[in-house]
Amino acid sequence: MSGTFSYDVKTKENEPLFEFNSAYSPRVSYHFNSKVSHYHYGVKHPMKPFRLMLTDHLVSSYGLHKIMDLYETRSATRDELLQFHSEDYVNFLSKVSPENANKLPRGTLENFNIGDDCPIFQNLYDYTTLYTGASLDATRKLINNQSDIAINWSGGLHHAKKNSPSGFCYVNDIVLSILNLLRYHPRILYIDIDLHHGDGVQEAFYTTDRVFTLSFHKYNGEFFPGTGDLTEIGCDKGKHFALNVPLEDGIDDDSYINLFKSIVDPLIMTFKPTLIVQQCGADSLGHDRLGCFNLNIKAHGECVKFVKSFGLPMLVVGGGGYTPRNVSRLWTYETGILNDVLLPEDIPEDIPFRDSFGPDYSLYPMLDDLYENKNSKKLLEDIRIRCLENIRYLQGAPSVRMDAECIPTQDISALTEEEDKIIQEMNEETEADSSNRLEEMEKENSGLIAFS
């Protein structure tokens, strides 16, 4: 089945840009504000928001924008940030600038973990609210049943903490999105395939059984952020609802894919999430500026494809990735996967900045030849066994209530007055109504119920 077409000025004919991989495609929404790519961490800083513009150009050049619902996103509000982040920290972000940073009381910047990784740059607060607003807009489309899959490549900044930035991340858009989704979904699975451990998300939901956090990452105790060992499995009510897959340098395509599928499949069957949040950090690719894995673009995408195959609603966000040309290749390829389309290898002729993809101009360059694979078969099998043991402890999906008491509040600030009112109305419903609502959610596997 043919996809969209471009007009070839040489042959005077319409040429297909891609083909659909199946007769049915999910409803996919694509959330982006071009302004977010104009911010600048600094000349020598590895994080380059320009990668987002490059991604958007490539997505459009392949014609993918014609088969998705496109949304120009808004900025998140202060009250929305306060659903997770502390008031002191949000106030600091909203007021600090390169001009006044050195005039702040001694120790202020250090207290908020400002430094080389997380610098103060021009219009920092505007940047954080733009990428966060995109994730929250995507979340609303899922809540309102207007999207099956919602994409925000500018999001996925998984290191940010309640009171401080960390690892290039200032506001944790993932945590904020999940907190909103928990009002409508009993169980959410978070999957992170960034090179670095998704510590900020794990920390936020470490004591709840309603969010299962799963992270595949490099770990040796010293590699940033220094967390993500197999022993980190959650605590209190959330014990066994966090799972980490610590890997060594140089893991290859087959090893990664096989390990990923062998863990994700039984986890989904056991935990029975009603929605999946997928973080697609591109620094796990080979040849990344800060990377140490040997993954090719199609291998990374195979993980996304596998998660999608379960047919659950998905919020898909970006994350790390410090070689912009490969970041844009990956996220364009995965945009295609999420739309069930096959993209040709040749980069379209009409894309702006096409020279960035030279000299091969391929969507699928070979990226698997840089590092020695230090992940032995025994190591990977030991990790797999440990992970499956943790999954067996779940003993089936937890039964949950859908009221305010069951939304994680540890280390989370008060909700806005409007949201408190909504939750109060939910609490006033009878226990019988709540029970019926949960039974309906269990029967519908999607579990997507929007309260008006």
UniProtKB/Swiss-Prot annotation:
One of the Pfam families matching this protein, by short name: Hist_deacetyl
General remark: Present with 4890 molecules/cell in log phase SD medium.
Region (Histone deacetylase): 26-340
Gene3D superfamilies registered for this protein in UniProt: Histone deacetylase domain
Entry-linked PANTHER family: HISTONE DEACETYLASE 3 (PTHR10625:SF36), HISTONE DEACETYLASE HDAC1-RELATED (PTHR10625)
Reactions it catalyzes: N(6)-acetyl-L-lysyl-[histone] + H2O = L-lysyl-[histone] + acetate
Subunit structure: Identified in a Set3C complex with SET3, HST1, SNT1, SIF2, CPR1 and HOS4/YIL112W.
Biased composition (Basic and acidic residues): 434-445
InterPro entries in the cross-refs: HDAC_PDAC, His_deacetylse, His_deacetylse_1, His_deacetylse_dom, His_deacetylse_dom_sf, Ureohydrolase_dom_sf
EC number: 3.5.1.98
Keywords: Activator, Chromatin regulator, Hydrolase, Nucleus, Transcription, Transcription regulation
Active site feature: H197
Places the protein is found: Nucleus
Gene Ontology MF term list: histone deacetylase activity; histone deacetylase activity, hydrolytic mechanism
Segments of this protein annotated with the region Disordered: 428-452
One Gene Ontology biological process: cellular response to starvation
Top-level taxon: Eukaryota
GO CC terms, sorted: cytoplasm; nuclear periphery; nucleus; Rpd3L-Expanded complex; Set3 complex
Gene giving rise to this polypeptide: HOS2
Biological function: Responsible for the deacetylation of lysine residues on the N-terminal part of the core histones (H2A, H2B, H3 and H4). It is apparently involved in transcriptional activation.
Protein name: Probable histone deacetylase HOS2
Classification of source organism: Eukaryota, Fungi, Dikarya, Ascomycota, Saccharomycotina
Keyword Magnesium: no
Family, per entry: Belongs to the histone deacetylase family. HD type 1 subfamily.
